[in-house]
Amino acid sequence: MQLAPSAEMIGWDTTALGLPNANLPFDLGVFTQHLEIPGVWLERGRIDASDDRLLNSPLGFAGHKCMASIFFVTGSALTRERREKALDAARAVLNTHPLKLTSGATCPNDHVVVVRVLAPLVEPAVNLLKQVWAAWRQELWQIKPNAPRIWSM
């Protein structure tokens, strides 16, 4: 992603590791993920299906089959007050959500606020991301959280 100095965006990434309800596990291959704002933020991950410790230990994914992130990024540095507003809005959602124990919000630098979540399936993770998206739109941009029509499919 490349952002102009005045740009702001909310984006997300959701990854399902296999299809658990179809008994099609992620048990072969490697998944590599790369999210970047050059010079500002770099997320890079590599998940090997044979890495049982990562996928199943309590210090890793603890058997969860979905990982997801939502991020608020800006082309110019956010003020501390705005970063705190974004974190507070996200944490208010997380604290009341069923996935609160496997989710968290952080601010790795003054251009990025990130929420990450692990879930047993995609749907609960996406539900959480939608709630954070709505909270951020309202708190950061004073825009009503009108969901895109495609979300109703």
Predicted regions and their residues:
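A structural signal for small-residue-enriched, beta-sheet-centric alpha/beta enzyme cores
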Residues: 13-153
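Intrinsically disordered, low-complexity linker/loop segments enriched in Gly/Pro
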Residues: 1-4
